[in-house]
From Swiss-Prot:
Entry comment describing in which tissues the protein is expressed: Expressed in the heart, kidney and liver and shows a circadian oscillation in these tissues with a peak at circadian time 14 hours (at protein level). Expressed in the brain, including the suprachiasmatic nucleus (SCN) of the brain, and in multiple peripheral tissues such as heart, liver and kidney. Exhibits a circadian oscillation in the peripheral tissues with a peak at circadian time 14 hours.
Domain of life assignment: Eukaryota
Name of the featured protein: CLOCK-interacting pacemaker
The species this protein was found in: Mus musculus
Keyword field contains Cell cycle: no
This protein's UniProt keywords: Biological rhythms, Coiled coil, Cytoplasm, Nucleus, Phosphoprotein, Repressor, Transcription, Transcription regulation
InterPro entries, per database record: CIPC (IPR031602)
Gene from which this protein is expressed: Cipc
Cellular compartments per GO CC: cytosol; nucleolus; nucleoplasm; nucleus
Biased composition (Polar residues): 272-283
Pfam families: CiPC
Bias type Low complexity, positions: 411-424
Keyword Transcription regulation (UniProt): yes
Region (Disordered): 71-98, 194-315, 408-432
């Protein structure tokens, strides 16, 4: 909507509002507020003019929200000389206050960029351009209600001044909250390397100083080990011992026997090197299924003990390398004559996994679980055989046939669960 103004002569402020309604025209958006220039009123016309009641009602209709249009055709609002009406002192002071308020709004509007006004208010009501007219606005407590209330218009006795009435712009989002959110987003970093790698790739693994020292000691022990290297059958045998814990003797006892047969000194519980005595088969059978993870075992030696013995005597790290449960894996990983480079990498990764499992205690749990599974399977087989023999005994008791007793006796003879005295008792008393 566009408002055209015309001015009458001889210092009398006359208003002529011409309203042109153009259909399907987008709502105009406001630029920055124009600079206001207050001029000294003329001395020749001391009387102040005011608007007539009919003129005020028309202007109220024009200033309603969403720009209510009066008519489609051009309309003249008439003239108003206002010769007998003057502004009171209270109204004059109020008009000055409103001028200062408009000046403050003009400065605030200059600070805001033009893009903010375009994006914040995509649909603005029509713009009203007036000359020598002051809008009486309500209290500026709420910005939304200040435009919904119908304003009143007053004519001031001054030179024609240009005012642009615009709806209040909503206050932008406080920059403090946005800055705090941005700072929080900048300070937040994802947790890197939260979980340890069980078996990292040799080229990508990251070891700390202790792990690097331990690996360096093991490499030095394996490379500087005197004497002829083991043949291809010996590491294969040792690998079978480590991979199959279902055998009666544990892998630690196998390694202990090998070290005893070769006459290599090993570490005792107190940390001093000593020579192991030959272990008989009965002691090996009565020994616990896993001794490599116990802290008081001669086979288990901590990393600090290995470092201390390496600095004190040259033979103690050698014995620790033989008695360590990981010696076979280290030997398999560092035998270039037997394995190719690709298989060495695989075995090195297997060694890393074995070391981590041994330190965390999972290796001990796994070996104990496998041993319990083996014992459970053996016990289950014995229970099945006992059930079968019980069924045969019930049938022989009911039928009292010599063939059933002979079959039961053959089953008991082939089984290892009963002794010979029990067989003699069953044969002597067939009617039991």
């Amino acid at each position: 909507m566009r408002l055209l103004t015309r001015r009458a002569g001889h210092g009398a402020a006359t208003l002529a509002l011409r309203v042109i309604h153009m259909q399907r025209v987008p709502v105009l958006r406001l630029p920055a507020i124009l600079d206001m220039e207050r001029k000294i009123p003329s001395r020749e016309s001391p009387r102040r003019l005011s608007a007539k009641p009919g003129r005020g009602t028309e202007m109220k209709k024009l200033a309603r929200p969403l720009g209510v249009v009066a008519a489609d055709s051009d309309k003249d609002s008439g003239f108003s000389d206002g010769s007998s009406e003057c502004l009171s002192s209270a109204e004059q002071m109020e008009s000055e206050d409103m001028l200062s308020a408009l000046g403050c709004k003009r400065e605030d509007k200059r600070r805001q960029p033009s893009k903010a006004a375009d994006t914040a208010l995509p649909t603005l009501p029509p713009m009203v351009v007036m000359k020598s007219v002051l809008v009486k606005q309500g209290s500026s407590s709420s910005q939304l209600q200040s435009w919904t209330v119908q304003p009143s218009f007053e004519v001031i006795s001054a030179q024609p001044q240009l005012f642009v009435l615009h709806p209040p712009v909503p206050s932008p989002v406080s920059s403090c909250q946005t800055g705090e959110k941005k700072s929080e987003s900048r300070n937040y970093l994802p947790i890197l390397n939260s979980y340890t790698k069980i078996a990292p790739h040799p080229g990508k693994r990251g070891l700390n100083s202790e792990d690097r020292g331990t690996s360096g000691v093991s490499k030095k022990l394996c490379t500087e080990r005197p004497g002829p290297s083991l043949s291809s059958s010996e590491p294969a045998k040792t690998g079978r011992v480590l991979s199959s814990p279902s055998t009666p003797a544990p892998p630690s006892s196998k390694l202990t026997e090998d070290s005893t047969l070769q006459g290599v000194p090993s570490l005792g519980a107190g940390g001093s090197p000593q020579t192991l005595q030959p272990v008989s088969s009965s002691h090996v059978a009565k020994a616990p299924s896993l001794t490599l993870a116990s802290p008081a075992s001669p086979v288990c030696a901590s990393d600090s003990t290995l470092h201390g013995l390496e600095s004190s005597s040259p033979l103690s790290p050698l014995s620790a390398s033989y008695t360590s449960p990981l010696w076979a894996a280290e030997h398999l990983c560092r035998s270039p004559d037997i394995f190719s480079e690709q298989r060495q990498n695989k075995h090195r990764r297997f060694q890393n996994t074995l070391v981590v499992l041994h330190k965390s205690g999972l290796l001990e749990i796994t070996l104990k679980t496998k041993e319990l599974i083996r014992q459970n399977q053996a016990t289950q087989a014995e229970l099945d055989q006992l059930k079968e023999q019980t069924q045969m005994f019930i049938e022989a008791t009911k039928s009292r046939a010599p063939q059933a007793w002979a079959k039961l006796q053959a089953s008991l003879t082939s089984g290892s669960s009963h002794s010979g005295s029990d067989l003699d008792t069953l044969s002597d008393h067939p009617d039991v």
